[in-house]
């Protein structure tokens, strides 16, 4: 089982060689500090950024930093991936693997049933999981998401664990309320939408949902019921895809369901558009 591998018994490739390298036969703080900087650079972690964001790193023993890398690597993450995560979140460099990182890994494995093979995928896609409290963030978010229908075959997976780092009161509920009140959908209808398209819960209300709804209703003269059937509409760029394709269809007097209008590639869309224009010309 995954957690057995994460019990702070470092894999052979870490246990002897790397830690002994930095164990240091000197008490010279200057030398030890330089060794730490070299170690961070070897991980592709920016030492200056790390020290600025996490001042505690300056006095932390290098063995504690190595133990963090060891644990993360034992989940199956590659060393470059570990370095990228530690560079993004330097506070992890001085975290306690036993009390701060392992609880997150156990939560993913035991409470969400994410497989051992998918644990590194979850972490790579959403490194913020590692700095999130299980009790105050991850578990409350999971409980709320279950009420929306993220259970059974629709349960949270490694593809959408990013939802777990969203604050329920400040982030998730306002989006649900907008879809209910702004579009007139019931909670059940909204729940079906977000389960079909979980990314809906990651989009900004003001910067994504509102402008796309306004364009759909005011410019496209669309029926909001179509948004229920195709919630993926919100995942497409308004400026780069929705507006240009709508403009082309409007210019040629062609009506097309949202899913057909947006899901195909640019090449396929242009091919369809040409075919529709030719058929229209033949009918004349």
From Swiss-Prot:
Keywords assigned: Chloroplast, Plastid, Transcription, Transcription regulation, Transcription termination, Transit peptide
A Pfam family assignment: mTERF
Intrachain disulfide bonds: none
Location of this chain's protein in the cell: Plastid, Chloroplast
Transit peptide location on this chain: 1-22
GO cellular component, one term: chloroplast
Phenotype seen when the gene is deleted: Albino seed and embryo defective when homozygous. Developmental arrest of the embryo from globular to mature stages.
One GO term (biological process): embryo development ending in seed dormancy
GO molecular function: double-stranded DNA binding
Family under the similarity heading: Belongs to the mTERF family.
Reported function: Transcription termination factor required for plastid-specific rRNA accumulation and protein synthesis in plastids. Essential for embryogenesis.
Name used for this protein in its record: Transcription termination factor MTEF1, chloroplastic
Organism per entry: Arabidopsis thaliana (Mouse-ear cress)
């Amino acid at each position: 089982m995954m957690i057995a591998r994460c019990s702070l018994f470092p894999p052979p490739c870490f246990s002897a060689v790397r830690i002994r390298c930095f164990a240091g036969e000197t008490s010279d703080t200057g030398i030890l500090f330089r060794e730490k900087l070299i170690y961070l650079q070897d991980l592709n972690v920016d030492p200056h950024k790390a020290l600025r964001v996490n001042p505690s790193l300056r006095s932390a023993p290098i063995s504690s930093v190595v133990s963090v890398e060891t644990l993360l690597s034992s989940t199956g993450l590659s060393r470059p991936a570990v370095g990228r995560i530690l560079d993004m979140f330097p506070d992890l460099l001085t975290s306690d693997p036993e009390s701060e990182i392992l609880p997150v890994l156990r939560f993913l494995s035991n409470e969400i049933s994410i497989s051992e093979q998918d644990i590194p995928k979850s972490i790579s896609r959403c490194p913020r999981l590692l700095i999130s409290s299980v009790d105050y963030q991850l578990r409350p978010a999971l409980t709320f998401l279950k009420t929306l229908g993220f259970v059974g075959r629709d349960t949270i997976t490694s593809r959408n664990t990013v939802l777990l780092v969203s604050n329920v009161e400040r982030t998730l509920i306002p989006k649900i309320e907008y879809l209910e009140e702004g579009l007139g959908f019931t909670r059940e209808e909204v729940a079906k939408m977000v389960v079909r398209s979980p990314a809906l819960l990651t989009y900004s209300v003001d910067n994504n949902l509102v402008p796309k709804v306004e364009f759909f209703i005011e410019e496209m003269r669309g029926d909001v019921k179509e948004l229920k059937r195709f919630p993926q509409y919100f995942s497409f760029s308004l400026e780069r895809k929705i507006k240009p394709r709508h403009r082309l269809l409007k210019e040629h007097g062609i009506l097309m369901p949202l899913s057909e209008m947006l899901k195909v590639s640019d090449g396929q869309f242009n091919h369809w558009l040409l075919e529709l224009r030719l058929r229209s010309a033949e009918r004349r």
